[in-house]
Amino acid sequence: MFIFDCEVFAYDWLFVFKDVETGEYTIIHNDNEAVKQFMARSPILGGFNNKHYDNHILKAVLCDADPKQVKEINDFIILKGHNGWENEFLSQYRVYFESFDLMDDCLVGLSLKAIEAHLGIPIEESEVDFDIDRPLTEEELSSTIFYCKYDVDATELLLRLRKIYLQNKMNLGRECGLSASKALYMTNAKLTAAYLKAEQRPHGDEREYQYPKQLLRQYIPDEVFHFFDRLQDLSIPDEEVFSESLDIMVGECPCTIAYGGIHGAIPCYSEETSKDRTIRNKDVASYYPHLMTLMGYCSRNIPSPEVYAETIERRVAAKKAHDGETADALKLVLNTTYGAMLNQYNDLYDPLMGRSVCISGQLFLLELAEHLILECPTLKVIQLNTDGIMVSLDYTDEPKYQEITEEWQVRTGFELEEDFIRKIVQKDVNNYVEVPMKGDPKIKGGLLVRGVLTNTKFELSKFGLRDWPQLKGGAFKINNNANIVAKAIVDRLAYGTPVEQTINDCNEIFEFQMIAKAGGKYSHSFHLVNGEQVPVQKVNRVYAAPFSVEHGCPYGTLYKTHAMKGSTSKISGLPEHCIVDNNNQLTIEAVDKTWYIRLARKYVNDFLGRKGLKRNTRRVNSLKKKCLTLL
């Protein structure tokens, strides 16, 4: 297995291949025959975004394209935004090699440079201009090789971090008779379809949804049925009906019903368990998989519903037998099937069944919530989401609460898993801190969740990394942006610790890093230093810089320039004064902790619903002008 990357210029192209086992590099520059000889070894190639880019450049070289043609294909993909297989030169040839893309099943928009930055390693970008209209000098070529090797090393690091994910794919491939390389090449959705032996069939009944007979309709407001009945009105275009939503109140909880599920939470709400009152959360175990099997919503493209039901049973058996490999591989199937049923390019595509899972799922939970509100006078719905409900109630209502939830389980066949909550603090449905009676707080939301998704517990120091928090989940994601602020918010909301204490007690500089990314639509970035525009990379690690009225600060913020429009704008989310440190040379003494304290306080107030005093911007600006006139 080799990790590879390529670079393309007007008169030069370069490939770097790294043997994962030996660590040996193979570097090839402008030599088509050398590439052919290397590929004759039938290597399995791994890269990042190689399906979209590097594979097509490699194919061009294997088809004897000269540097000019390779550059044209590069521009066809990068500048013009086309797919490589649409290129006229490439479409003439049939070239096959085994590869996989570590960008598959990643969070959309995540770049390799951003991953490097969030991992805390130096962010290295090539200083050689890709628009050079002449052959590279020896110095430029040497520099390009260095940076290309650096990206290959970073991709190899990502390979090791995603070891569990890749192993699950290979195990699942083995289950359905696929080679390891074939399984790695496929996305989770494609691999799931292959495992379930799905064969795409035409379906023209996406809007013929039927309400499940197990539903107690009397507890659900009529307006909800009116909303979903619009499916039957074919005069309403698909794009209109499926983009609609309905806002309702479930007790005191504002909820939104839509074709992506139900979501609701009392905004800026907090509550603690007391001697008279309890907070409970009930999630439906494997809700969407069981909707498919119990309600008959499996894709009609698989041989029979029993195939999917057997997968659930096999996973349960594997977990009981402590067969982690099989259990994790089958979990991939269960977590991926629903989304694949709504993907028109997947063999599981069956939109009626996909819509039915989502609609019935929210109706059953809405029915439960409304029933509880009706018969438990002290009960309050705190949260209602796609697979669970959180409530608080007096202990006097608990017998009725348990009676209703038990009846719901028996009637529907679903299983509710209950958690006892000590404290809940939520900003909205997507941002909350939930403190259980036992264990660490459960957190959700972009303001709070930090770390790298590994789905296991690695010793990250073995990879030369600091001990970042490790997450579990689906698509690969990483976010180590201003971690200290997230920690300060959680400590304050969960335990009452002042944000000043959490932040001032921390002297680990990486906890304060912020990753400034310009984005693909921008040609370059610059840093304002002493009023001058200093060019910087498109992805940068920055820290808040100290500022005083007496001494000021030489450092401004970072800006980005739009590639097409030429317009300049600030990179959002950064301090007015910040320092760039892509090579990790700064110490904590250079960081302005007060900026992070102010930010943490603001977010805590957002959670608690405390609105800060609004500044009269017009009056402030007017006073500024008057002062300047006097000077």
Spell out what each predicted region is.
Residues 15, 52-64, 285-299:
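Short active-site loop/helix that positions an aromatic residue
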Residues 4-6, 28-29, 47-50, 282, ...:
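Short His-Asn-centered micro-motif
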